């Protein structure tokens, strides 16, 4: 596929999946499309949420993979989703029902700040990656203890949130997520050349006059905020952060961030809308997180079996 054709084609594919998700995102199919209230009140927010969440997680994954030079890195590996899970678990223990989103966002934000604090003290990608992984393990252990000591009735809301869903966000949440995505996209665009240099190593980036620490900090800040916003509203949605950037590199045949940033946004949005559509076409809707795993696992396996080092391809 030619580079010049990849973005227009991705726009068409993403628009197609979005339209299908809007039209067929439920068991009643086209018949329900005549009901304006159903479309505007339920299906449109859900489809927009899927579109924005996919784009956000894919953009976050692209930045993480670039600064760590690892095709399997994504925002969740840094403990952000685990922090959101801790906030959600504490909220359910406290008997907070509809307010689970705010504790989840607070937990994700605290973990993000811890990672950013470490990032400001070290320039080692491996040290930062190990800290994020260990932070995630530690927080998940606390969540497991809380689950063990919480009544089953209180855990229903937590289990529902942790399964992942695009149905929990209204238009206010959509506006918030769109604003976070716009800010992150601006940050990534400004940081694009620096991330190109980082692909060749910190030493090369420094030799070219860039500041690797600043580049990594901006990428981590952007990715963490995206993951925190998405996870707090929708629960942990995995694999988009890995699959989206990988598909983008394959389609645009480049690792230059001027090309991969828009392609990653579109790939993530398309995959997310497709997963949401597949989760809704059955008589009983399936958890979108599980459907995403089914879609994403083959992509991850393909990366593992045929991966090559990330490098800038012209």
PLM-predicted stretches and their roles:
Residues 1-314:
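Alpha-helical transmembrane segments in inner-membrane proteins
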């Amino acid at each position: 596929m030619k580079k010049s054709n990849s973005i227009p084609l991705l726009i068409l594919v993403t628009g197609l999946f979005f339209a299908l998700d809007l039209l067929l995102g439920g068991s009643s199919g086209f018949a329900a499309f005549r009901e304006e209230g159903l479309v505007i009140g339920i299906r449109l927010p859900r489809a927009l949420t899927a579109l924005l969440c996919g784009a956000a997680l894919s953009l976050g994954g692209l930045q993480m993979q670039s600064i760590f030079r690892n095709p399997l890195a994504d925002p969740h590996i840094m403990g952000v989703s685990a922090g959101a899970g801790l906030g959600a678990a504490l909220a359910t223990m406290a008997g907070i029902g509809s307010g689970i989103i705010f504790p989840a966002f607070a937990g994700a934000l605290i973990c993000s700040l811890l990672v950013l604090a470490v990032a400001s003290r070290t320039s080692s990608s491996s040290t930062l990656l190990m800290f994020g992984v260990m932070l995630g393990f530690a927080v998940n252990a606390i969540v497991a203890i809380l689950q063990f000591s919480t009544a089953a009735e209180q855990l229903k809301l937590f289990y529902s949130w942790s399964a992942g869903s695009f149905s929990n966000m209204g238009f206010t949440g959509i506006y918030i997520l769109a604003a976070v995505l716009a800010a992150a996209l601006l940050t990534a665009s400004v940081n694009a050349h620096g991330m190109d240099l980082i692909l060749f190593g910190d030493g090369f980036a420094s030799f070219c006059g860039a500041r690797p620490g600043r580049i990594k900090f901006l990428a981590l800040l952007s990715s963490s905020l995206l993951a925190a916003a998405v996870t707090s509203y929708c629960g942990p949605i995995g694999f988009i952060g890995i699959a989206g950037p990988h598909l983008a590199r394959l389609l645009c045949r480049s690792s230059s961030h001027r090309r991969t940033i828009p392609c990653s946004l579109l790939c993530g949005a398309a995959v997310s809308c497709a997963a949401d559509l597949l989760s809704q076409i059955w008589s009983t809707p399936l958890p979108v997180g599980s459907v995403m795993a089914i879609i994403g696992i083959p992509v991850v396996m393909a990366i593992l079996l045929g991966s090559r080092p990330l490098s800038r391809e012209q």
